[in-house]
Amino acid sequence: MNSIKFPVLDRTTTNSVISTTLNDLSNWSRLSSLWPLLYGTSCCFIEFASLIGSRFDFDRYGLVPRSSPRQADLILTAGTVTMKMAPSLVRLYEQMPEPKYVIAMGACTITGGMFSTDSYSTVRGVDKLIPVDVYLPGCPPKPEAVIDAITKLRKKIAREIYKDRIRPQQGNRCFTTNHKFFVVRSPHTGNYDQELLYPPSSTSEISTETFFKYKSPVSSHELVN
């Protein structure tokens, strides 16, 4: 029998002690065990299914697909999202425990794609329903692109701090402390520019008395003069 030799334990302090923080340890454990909830409604999801095979082997990233949103921390949306499916998608996202992440895969998920042209039943962008962490364009994206999106998400998780995980509102999802983004006032305030509703002062104005003075049809030249 072949003898098994165990390596000699290095007793030096520099190689046997690891200094880290609880935040880094938590990030490392989460990025190494992402459990995705697969939400595929169209053809883009076929490309993700090829990752399950031995050629790409997405299990090496610790991805374990789950069928229940309560056990998942990543939802991967692929395909067209219709108005009828929108409530189901939002319900699945709300049932996922925090912290949770979203990858939008494909042009139809990101912008609505060709199905949103003159369509009243297609959602033009899944980010109108749930916050998105990584956008993956393509029609459809290649499996290598999906792996790249997962790698970028892992890097984002590795840089997170505790304050970034507290996201009570959907509007603050894109703001992270470590990225040093500036908080901009929401444009959807309802206070529209009233100047756009009126013609500029350089145009000719016709008084109400002049307009109602004429009972019979007259030319526009007479009204202006």
Curated annotation (Swiss-Prot):
Its cofactor is [4Fe-4S] cluster. It catalyses: a plastoquinone + NADH + (n+1) H(+)(in) = a plastoquinol + NAD(+) + n H(+)(out); a plastoquinone + NADPH + (n+1) H(+)(in) = a plastoquinol + NADP(+) + n H(+)(out). It comes from the Eukaryota. Binds 1 [4Fe-4S] cluster. It is found in: Plastid, Chloroplast thylakoid membrane. It is a peripheral membrane protein. [4Fe-4S] cluster binds at C43, C44, C108, C139. One of its GO terms (biological process) is electron transport coupled proton transport. It holds the Pfam family Oxidored_q6. Its main location: plastid. Its EC number is 7.1.1.-. GO terms for cellular component: chloroplast thylakoid membrane; respiratory chain complex I. GO terms for molecular function: 4 iron, 4 sulfur cluster binding; iron ion binding; NADH dehydrogenase (ubiquinone) activity; quinone binding. Keywords: 4Fe-4S, Chloroplast, Iron, Iron-sulfur, Membrane, Metal-binding, NAD, NADP, Plastid, Plastoquinone, Quinone, Thylakoid, Translocase, Transport. NDH is composed of at least 16 different subunits, 5 of which are encoded in the nucleus. Belongs to the complex I 20 kDa subunit family. NDH shuttles electrons from NAD(P)H:plastoquinone, via FMN and iron-sulfur (Fe-S) centers, to quinones in the photosynthetic chain and possibly in a chloroplast respiratory chain. The immediate electron acceptor for the enzyme in this species is believed to be plastoquinone. Couples the redox reaction to proton translocation, and thus conserves the redox energy in a proton gradient. This is NAD(P)H-quinone oxidoreductase subunit K, chloroplastic. It comes from Lepidium virginicum (Virginia pepperweed). The gene is ndhK.
